[in-house]
Amino acid sequence: MNVRRNVNTPEQNSKASVDPGGREPQRWLILLAMTGSLAMIMLDTTVVAVALPTIQKNLGIDQNILEWIIIAYLVVLASFMALGGKLGDLFGKPQAFLIGTIGFGFSSLMCGLAWSGESLVGFRILQGFFAVIMQPASSAIVINSFAPGERGKAMAVYAGIPLLFMTAGPVVGGLITEYASWRYCFLLNVPIAVLVATMSVVLKPKDPKRADKKRFDWTGTGLLGTGMPCFIIAIQQASEWGWNSPLTLGLGGLGLLMLSAFVIVEFRVQDPIVSLGLFRQKVFLGDSILLFVTQASLTGVSIFVVIHLQVVMNFSPERAGIAMLPMLLPAAFMIYVAGRSYDRMGGRIPVILGGLLICTGLGLLAVGMGQRSYLIMGIGMGLVGLGVPFVQLPANTDGMSRVHATRRGMASGVLQTFRQVGSVIGLAVIGAVIAATQSAQLNSDPEIAAHADLAKSSLVDRAARGNSNALEKLRSEDPEVADSLAKVVSDGIETGMWTAAGFSSMIIFIGIFLLEGHPANDPEE
């Protein structure tokens, strides 16, 4: 008997194997629902950031509590994304997605009804827990709904439309805060969640069932659930507490100890939260490292560029937000091209191209900061925006395509964990480089050293962080100190951008040595 191998092209496979239940048109509606869920998460991130000053004034909360409105949410995302992905594999991705979506909508409602800073932080933590259940399930459902030849295109839609929502976030947040109430920044998630959840129930996405018995790794859950938050909080707060402080070292050390124990446990249990065998696949390992490095390089860019524009170049907050569009818009519009490129040639060439664009763009951004030229900075931001889709989209699509459909929730959770942890570590390292450079400037420049006592004041500290009210007050009270501060901030952030460019150069080498020149096909279980 002759056995014929399947030698169809990706395009033929797409037509032959998509949703064998005969639900071809519905996969695009499923994609729309999954895209809506991610758009909700990404819009929430930028809208809330704009509303923080108004929230602080309305609820009467101090700066420490205000910062935890953002930090608490990010800690949960970085700490529990892998667990959320595993839950989808164990109990069903559509079920996990539905629970996550309803829970995210409910917690958003409670955030909008918060009566104090502490209650808002608590509901933001709850919001984060439901996000880590919803997001890995949604991306796995997208991959499972499309055949290998169309996954890049589908993931481009899944990631591209939410990117436009994120781009519009500052404008939407500003309008809501000015003409309505900051509470609607959270409440706008509720109708989106209801619509997305309803579509999920009606469309019933397919989900391959596991043949083996499901077991829950309670020991691994406990170790991961304590180790990751300890480590992430220590890294995030190191600039505030001091890198050598007992609190930073103690909490960080405890986190690393717990995570080491987690790795040992995962090698031994029958059904781990994270199957460490995934990392024996060279390309999956490359995809994971790629997301870590990319986020480490880029997370601080938008934050520090906005500070540079306001403190050094005297941009208003509104103008500084608009000035970031050269980086955001190209990313939103090029992601479809990146998706089709992955479908045709795999990850290697798109990632190398994206790495070159990002590294060059960050270098130009640093040069533009040194020369205080927005034109050069804008070109640099544009190159970064062009490069990002060619790196992140192939890494996500390729990584999930290399595992069986029953394990894609776990794969998605692992990839997003690398991405989130990269954000935290990159921001901490680049922030430390900037702080060290600024400290050296304060101690070595005679003109600045003359104002060293003022540099330690609350007003100057808040101005250096981009606080618009503090900036205006400092410029009116002491223009000389404001000019000195601008020089310190400029030199520090320029050094930080060169550090980010150095990080991003690793993307090119990962593309050359760890990725493949063809898209991944579905593996056997």
How would you name each of these model-derived features?
Residues 19-23, 197-225, 267-282, 343, ...:
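Flexible interhelical linker loops that connect adjacent transmembrane helices
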Residues 55-56, 87-88, 172-180, 235, ...:
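Interfacial helix-cap and linker-helix signal at transmembrane-aqueous boundaries
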Residues 38, 101, 107-108, 123-124, ...:
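A generic transmembrane-helix signature of 12-TM secondary carrier transporters
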Residues 25-77, 161-162, 181, 219-221, ...:
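Transmembrane core module of solute transporters
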Residues 159, 165-168, 377-459:
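Small-residue-rich alpha-helical segments with characteristic i,i+4
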Residues 151, 190-209, 225-236, 255-269, ...:
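C-terminal membrane-cytosol helix-exit motif in multi-pass small-molecule transporters
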Residues 81-220, 246:
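Helix-loop-helix hairpins in multi-pass membrane proteins, especially solute transporters
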